[in-house]
């Protein structure tokens, strides 16, 4: 999100990242009275917004949230910066969030979560915001250091609340191959993510406004693959698997037709898992 300051520069809101514009009421204005969180939608909405609000704000007792979403059918892959914009207003009777898309509404709810956690829900608070950058990503190298699925989900939770929108998962390298290929199980590491686990993680990410982007390293960085499939290497000889960091010589043979079959079928398998 844009790092521009508030209208009152001395009263910046404790929000990460700082919103594009915000107006904070005077100190004399008391915090809004707490009440059980309720949702009211002005029109048809994406069920993901409702689930997001209840998951993160259900126990915050922020009272009534009036949500207005202009177009709930825009896919996350297609959104631009302006489609993630939102406006948030705290009134005495309710909290209002208006957004052009599902994803803007989710960003607004993330801001509301941050404000509510710090007891700053004062009547008169208003925020207008949109991202400064289209790609706000985090890359995790699970090839060299396997990360349990539950930890990945917890990471996605925190990413979403801080308005990151891309999780780049580095699934393979010389030290490991974590994509649980059913077509080529011989190249898969002992610790890996099954296809169903990755599908589930992709859905979990999308429900929180985060795209899951997989990476399989080819034709280099393939020591782990060549150790099981020496027929794909230029030398035709197996390499020893390694956990050492650094430069490794293993690569796939571009003159070998079987390499193209291997790569094509692997990518087809990958594309069936990730939206």
Predicted segments, located by residue:
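Feature activates predominantly on carbohydrate-active enzymes
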Residues: 76, 81-275
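Acidic, contiguous N-terminal accessory segments
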Residues: 1-131, 136
């Amino acid at each position: 999100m844009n790092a521009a300051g508030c209208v009152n520069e001395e009263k910046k809101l404790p929000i990460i990242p700082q919103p594009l514009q915000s107006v904070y009421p005077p100190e004399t204005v008391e915090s809004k009275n707490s009440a059980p969180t309720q949702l009211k939608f002005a029109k048809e909405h994406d069920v993901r917004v409702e689930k997001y609000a209840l998951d993160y704000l259900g126990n915050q007792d922020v009272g009534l949230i009036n949500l207005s979403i202009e177009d709930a059918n825009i896919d996350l892959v297609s959104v631009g910066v302006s489609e993630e914009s939102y406006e948030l207003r705290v009134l005495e009777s309710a909290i209002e969030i208006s957004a052009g898309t599902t994803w803007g509404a989710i960003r607004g709810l993330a801001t509301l979560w941050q404000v509510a956690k710090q007891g700053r829900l004062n009547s008169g608070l208003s925020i207008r915001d949109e991202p400064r950058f289209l790609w706000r990503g985090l890359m995790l190298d699970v090839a060299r250091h396997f990360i349990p699925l539950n930890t990945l989900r917890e990471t996605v939770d925190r990413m979403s609340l801080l308005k990151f929108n891309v999780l780049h998962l580095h699934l393979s390298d010389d030290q490991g191959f974590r994509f649980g290929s059913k077509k080529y199980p011989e190249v898969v590491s002992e610790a890996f993510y099954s296809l169903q686990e990755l599908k589930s993680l992709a859905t979990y990410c999308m429900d929180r406004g985060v795209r899951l982007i997989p990476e399989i390293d080819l034709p280099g960085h393939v020591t782990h693959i060549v150790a099981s499939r020496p027929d794909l290497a230029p030398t035709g000889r197996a390499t020893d698997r390694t956990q050492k960091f650094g430069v490794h010589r293993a690569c796939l043979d571009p003159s070998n037709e079987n390499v193209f079959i291997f790569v094509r079928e692997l990518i087809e398998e990958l594309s069936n898992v990730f939206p």
